[in-house]
């Protein structure tokens, strides 16, 4: 490697778990690179380490998926990694490079924060081991392989049970839901924590004069605790991931919330203050089903496509079939289409310009002080009718390219919880202005002191991008780790511009998205 001129990138996987992201530049930068095949890097083993307090380490190679990781650690030691990314086929290398998170992130931070050490292929051709807190370790998360290529990592694990008891708390405004999330973070008692806020099309609420209509959204906060054992399983169990004929998890939560509000309206005693309301529903979910609850349906991106009956005849029959394929009763036959592994395979066949026009898929990390204003703006400005995922994440001050990064000299938050709120905004737009809405999101996110993840469509100018991600620090670190000439830059990897060519392929694919 040290003597060759061609830059290096990872060969995309053939199983749907590969390294091609949905970012606009993902399909182009690898064309000028020599590609390294890591498909055989799938070994896992447990290793006790007395230096890691209250945890054990699992040593796994870069291409191990989250599903393989969880099944191995549960089977070997009844443990799970401290943070498990939400999709079954996300790889360990991808979770590190892409700054993955999930519902334990309020407690442990992002996936990278639970990594004890990493073996990295550097630009000089050496394989080095970097430990937590080292310069290279701090540079890897959020840089998408532009600092070095992850080969192997040691992840911290914690004891686990086979079941999770999930408690659901209902709120009739997003402000109350956010407050509840922050209150739970401050309590530092719960293992799993996230929330969903629903649009009025899915969770209709009665009007209240003294509330901001934009923020009046049915919102649910979910708290999870580990319970039970294989020898003594709970008698009452709840939602299960059933690929054929089962409900998407968000549908299950939405139905619970609607039923709760219906009963509350009937009793005329709906309350919004978390200090006076108890969980309206509890259920027990298998650990694996809970960890990957958003995998089936890709959160809600596989939701049934809505169309007006009077326009039905304007659709071709095969497109009508596509529209109805994701309805629950049809999933008895079509269910296997809606795992993320299959959905991303299909999505990657679509021209990136079509994806940019038709979809808004973004994760924006927003400080607690400004998150309510951010969500109000999203509701007013982006025409999607899907839920928004709310997931608190501990901020860090040593990984400068992650969305959860907070400089040490930044002003202290006015709330007690040391977290950012990840707002997962995933939806389709019918007017073909997805790229415009994404640009507006990028600007608003920065304006309110946040950062977004870079795995999806990005439309930053180069100057705006390097203002946010500090090119001076980035270039110094790239040079010190011999990455400058060896790997494409972070901007090249994530911010290519997709052009709309009006080809017949794009015209047809635009009907599907």
Q: Can you name each region flagged by the protein language model?
A:
Residues 1-513:
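Noncatalytic alpha-helical scaffold of FAD-dependent oxidoreductases
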């Amino acid at each position: 490697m040290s003597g060759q001129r061609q830059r290096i990138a990872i060969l995309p996987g053939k199983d749907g778990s590969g390294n091609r992201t949905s970012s606009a530049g993902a399909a182009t930068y690898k064309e000028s690179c020599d590609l390294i095949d890591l498909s055989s890097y799938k070994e896992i083993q447990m290793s006790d380490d007395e230096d890691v307090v209250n945890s054990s380490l699992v040593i796994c190679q870069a291409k191990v998926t989250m599903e393989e990781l969880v099944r191995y650690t549960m089977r070997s030691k009844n443990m799970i990694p401290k943070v498990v990314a939400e999709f079954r086929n996300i790889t360990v290398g991808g979770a590190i490079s892409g700054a993955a998170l999930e519902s334990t992130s309020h407690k442990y931070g992002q996936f990278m924060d639970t990594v004890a050490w990493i073996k990295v292929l550097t630009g000089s051709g050496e394989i080095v081991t970097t430990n937590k807190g080292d310069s290279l370790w701090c540079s890897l998360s959020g840089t998408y392989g532009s600092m070095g290529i992850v080969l192997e990592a040691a992840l911290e694990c914690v004891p686990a049970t086979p079941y999770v008891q999930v408690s659901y708390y209902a709120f009739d405004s997003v402000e109350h839901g956010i407050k509840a999330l922050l209150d739970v973070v401050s309590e530092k008692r719960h293992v799993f924590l996230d929330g969903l806020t629903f649009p009025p099309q899915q969770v209709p609420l009665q009007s209240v004069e003294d509330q901001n209509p934009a923020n009046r959204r049915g919102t649910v906060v979910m708290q999870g605790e580990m319970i039970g054992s294989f020898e003594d399983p709970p008698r009452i169990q709840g939602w299960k991931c059933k690929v054929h004929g089962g409900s998407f998890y968000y549908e299950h939560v939405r139905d619970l919330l609607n039923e709760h509000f219906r009963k509350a309206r009937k009793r005329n005693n709906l309350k919004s203050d978390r200090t006076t309301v108890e969980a309206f529903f509890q259920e027990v979910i298998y650990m694996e089903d809970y960890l990957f609850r958003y995998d089936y349906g890709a959160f809600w991106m596989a939701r049934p496509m809505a169309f007006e009956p009077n326009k039905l005849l304007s659709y071709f029959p095969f497109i009508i079939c596509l529209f109805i394929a994701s309805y629950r009763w049809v999933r008895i036959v079509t269910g296997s289409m809606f795992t993320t592994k299959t959905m991303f395979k299909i999505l990657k066949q679509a021209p990136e310009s079509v994806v940019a026009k038709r979809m808004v898929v973004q994760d924006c990390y927003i400080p607690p002080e400004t998150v309510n204003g951010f969500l109000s703006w999203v509701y007013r400005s982006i025409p999607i009718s899907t839920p928004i995922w709310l997931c608190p994440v501990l901020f860090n001050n040593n990984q400068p390219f992650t969305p959860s990064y907070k400089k040490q000299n930044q002003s202290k938050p006015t709330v007690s919880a040391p977290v950012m709120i990840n707002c997962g905004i995933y939806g389709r737009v019918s007017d073909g202005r997805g790229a415009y809405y994404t640009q507006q999101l990028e600007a608003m996110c920065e304006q309110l002191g946040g950062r977004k993840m870079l795995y999806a469509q990005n439309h930053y100018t180069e100057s705006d991008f390097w203002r946010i991600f500090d090119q001076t620090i980035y270039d110094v670190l790239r040079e010190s780790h011999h990455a400058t000439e060896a790997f494409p830059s972070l901007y090249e990897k994530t911010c290519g511009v997709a052009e709309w060519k009006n080809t017949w392929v794009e015209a047809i694919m635009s009907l599907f998205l």
